From Swiss-Prot:
Name by which UniProt lists this protein: GTPase Der
Database matches in InterPro entries: AAA+_ATPase, G_ENGA, GTP-bd, GTPase_Der, KH_dom-like, KH_dom-like_a/b, P-loop_NTPase, Small_GTP-bd
Keyword annotations from UniProtKB, A to Z: GTP-binding, Nucleotide-binding, Repeat, Ribosome biogenesis
Similarity comment: Belongs to the TRAFAC class TrmE-Era-EngA-EngB-Septin-like GTPase superfamily. EngA (Der) GTPase family.
Domain of life from the UniProt record: Bacteria
Gene Ontology molecular function terms on file: ATP hydrolysis activity; GTP binding; ribosome binding
One of the GO biological process terms: ribosome biogenesis
Signal sequence annotation: none
Organism: Leifsonia xyli subsp. xyli (strain CTCB07)
Task of the protein: GTPase that plays an essential role in the late steps of ribosome biogenesis.
Residue stretches making up the EngA-type G domain: 47-210, 221-394
Subunit structure: Associates with the 50S ribosomal subunit.
Pfam families according to UniProt: KH_dom-like (PF14714), MMR_HSR1 (PF01926)
Length: 481
């Protein structure tokens, strides 16, 4: 059926709905038939403020105080902020970027050494630095080491003497003149005391446009990297970004805050959101892991497409399936990345294919890439998979074509008779994209099996690779004359 004929048929079907009881919401829906794509804007790079200091001096609490919301994971355990994390902030009408870093320990071993290295990188990428010291502890040898690094940076440095909760404790802040960084600013991240005055001074030193940050594009496609702890999410982002962006350690769960990074892949910019992994038994978790899990869900809400990373060296688990189901519930596009593929032998590969067929049958439509995040093998296949998934996610089927599709489908395979009645599809329309959401007006309730059949046929005819499809029903009765 050509487009003109399909449109004429749809108009006739639509007019037939006037014989049925329609409410205001129905009428509003029937008027919708346009694109809903967001415009992409280009924004100047915002000035960057890095917040650095030893572990557990209150850096993340200060970030939360500046932002006015709980963003950085805060706990009374040294080293709980392990990655460099960027947040957008605004103060007195000025927008800027805040970078929270893990704590410094000059002689750190293992993961602490990685965090220290990232803090040094953060200083290089900042326009100004807030150096946080615990005024109640005073200057330590570690602080002296940090001061030497700060002096090398030649950046404006503001000394925040934290944990000064009232005027009686201000002499402790005064003692920090000894560090040679100029005036110590007594603040209390816990109570907010002194933070506003310090921010006023910092903003005077920050340029209007960052001298160091990459140019920020307003609309890079947003990708959430999801998966169980230690499946290779951070390694995947590091390989894509070409730098040690996220602390990678064999200890499961070493990523606690989602970390955004703009990465150029396949000739375009993407914004990857690396997450903490979704933990089992959330209600049993310690504080930091609990909040990080909540943040993972938030990261997914901010994303347009999710890459779920699965470790092929282990069987597909219930937790893997739950993470995939979370993506489906959120309505995001989906790509499956099977990591550590280079480690598979033939026997494990055959067994894995059977697992995929059995456990992931409900997402057989998702693009699949077999990669090695560690070596970067087949990473180039990720971009075409993301592009296909996003294109499907934004697809809109014209109303005429959709109704022609429904007519052909119901003619070849009408709904079964139930209780002496056979529900009919009167008319259909696509209400939105992102994900594609269809509404059908019917004379009766459609069986779940029949709805699955409609969705399956939609995929066969139109593709929709990499996106969930939502099919809603509106059962309507004829008007009583």
């Amino acid at each position: 059926m050509d487009d003109d004929l399909a449109l004429q048929r749809a108009v006739a079907l639509r007019s037939g709905l006037d014989d049925y009881e329609l409410d205001d919401a129905d009428l509003d829906l029937l008027e919708v038939d346009g694109e809903d794509a967001d415009a992409i804007a280009f924004l100047p790079a915002l000035p960057v403020l890095a917040i650095v200091g030893r572990p557990n001096v209150g850096k993340s609490a200060l970030v939360n105080r500046i932002l006015g919301r709980r963003e950085a994971v805060v706990e009374d355990t040294p080293g709980v902020t392990r990655d460099r994390v960027s947040y957008r902030a605004e103060w007195n009408g000025r927008r800027f970027t805040v970078v929270d870093t893990g704590g410094w320990e000059p002689d750190a071993r293992g993961i602490d050494a990685s965090v220290a290295a990232q803090a040094e990188v953060a200083i290089d990428l900042a326009d100004a630095v807030m150096f946080v010291v615990d005024a109640m502890v005073g200057a330590t040898s570690t602080d002296e080491h940090v001061v030497r690094l700060l002096r090398k940076s030649d950046k404006p440095v503001f000394l925040a003497a934290n944990k000064v909760d009232d005027a009686r404790q201000e002499p402790s802040a005064t003692e920090l003149w000894s560090l040679g960084l100029g005036e110590p600013h007594p603040v209390s991240a816990l109570h907010g005391r002194g933070v506003a005055d310090l921010l006023d001074k910092i903003l005077k030193a920050l340029p209007d446009v960052s001298a160091v940050a990459k140019q920020e594009v307003g609309g890079p496609r947003r990708v959430a990297i999801l998966g169980r702890p230690n499946v290779g999410k951070s390694s995947l982002l590091n390989k894509a970004a070409g730098e040690e962006r996220v602390v990678v350690n064999e200890l499961a769960g070493t990523t606690r805050d989602p970390v955004d990074e703009q990465v150029e892949l396949g000739g375009r910019v993407w914004r990857f959101v690396d997450t903490a992994g979704i933990r089992r038994r959330v209600h049993l978790q310690q504080g930091a892991d609990f909040y990080a899990s909540l943040r993972t869900s938030t990261a997914l809400e901010k994303a347009e497409v999710a890459v779920v990373v699965l470790d092929v060296s282990q069987p597909i688990s219930e937790q893997d399936v739950r993470i995939i189901d979370l993506v489906l519930e959120s309505g995001r596009a989906l790509v499956l990345a099977f990591n550590k593929w280079d480690l598979l032998d033939d026997e494990r590969r055959r067994y894995l294919e059977r697992e995929i067929e059995q456990d992931l049958a409900h997402v057989s439509w998702a693009p699949r890439v077999n990669i090695s995040a560690r070596t970067g093998r087949h990473l180039e296949k990720l971009v075409p998979a993301l592009e296909r998934a996003l294109e499907s996610w934004e697809t809109r089927i014209p109303t005429g074509k959709f109704n022609a599709f429904l007519a052909e489908l119901t003619s070849a395979h009408p709904h079964p008779v139930r209780g002496g009645k056979q529900p009919r599809i009167l008319f259909g329309t696509q209400s939105t994209s992102r994900p594609p959401t269809f509404v059908v007006f019917t004379t009766g309730f459609l069986d779940p099996g029949y709805r699955r059949y409609v969705i399956r046929r939609l995929r066969e005819v139109y593709g929709f690779e990499g996106t969930p499809i939502v099919l809603n029903m509106r059962v309507r009765e004829k008007r009583k004359h």
